[in-house]
């Protein structure tokens, strides 16, 4: 199963401040929507609570608290390991979309990283991990917006 991390970060590495994303760059979330349409998303419980269920996506939520969901597009797992094991039986591609602990746990297992850097420095308590040295930048595009951002694709190799 191919694992892709997808995130937006500030120039100083912040991805969140509690449950909030501390910026709103017009157009940046369209990249997320386009890439994750009809895909499986692996998220932690706090990220899932803050983002809710987006249409045309399936969710694997990791929660040690044993939450449940009646939504047919949401599966809950007690650990990342069990989630990966079970998801490998039903999909060949998984998008990891947060939060910080999930990114830190899976960045070494990722095959691809989709990263938007929003050109602003903000305060926050959740940071994206350092991209490992065995990843190579294979694509980069700058976007003009109310807050400019750069979208990058990194591949393990």
From Swiss-Prot:
Q: Which GO terms describe its molecular function?
A: dihydrofolate reductase activity; NADP binding
Q: Where is the DHFR domain?
A: 2-156
GO biological process: one example: tetrahydrofolate biosynthetic process
This protein's pathway reads: Cofactor biosynthesis; tetrahydrofolate biosynthesis; 5,6,7,8-tetrahydrofolate from 7,8-dihydrofolate: step 1/1
* This protein's UniProt keywords: Antibiotic resistance, Methotrexate resistance, NADP, One-carbon metabolism, Oxidoreductase, Plasmid, Transposable element, Trimethoprim resistance
Its EC number is 1.5.1.3
Question: Which EC class, in a word?
Answer: oxidoreductase
SUPFAM superfamilies from the entry? Answer: Dihydrofolate reductase-like
GO cellular-component term (any): cytosol
Q: Which family does it belong to?
A: Belongs to the dihydrofolate reductase family.
Purpose: Key enzyme in folate metabolism. Catalyzes an essential reaction for de novo glycine and purine synthesis, and for DNA precursor synthesis.
PANTHER family per UniProt: DIHYDROFOLATE REDUCTASE
Subunit notes for this chain? Answer: Homodimer.
Q: What is this protein called?
A: Dihydrofolate reductase type 7
What is the scientific name of the source organism?
Escherichia coli
Its lineage reads:
Bacteria, Pseudomonadati, Pseudomonadota, Gammaproteobacteria, Enterobacterales
Name the gene for this chain: dhfrVII
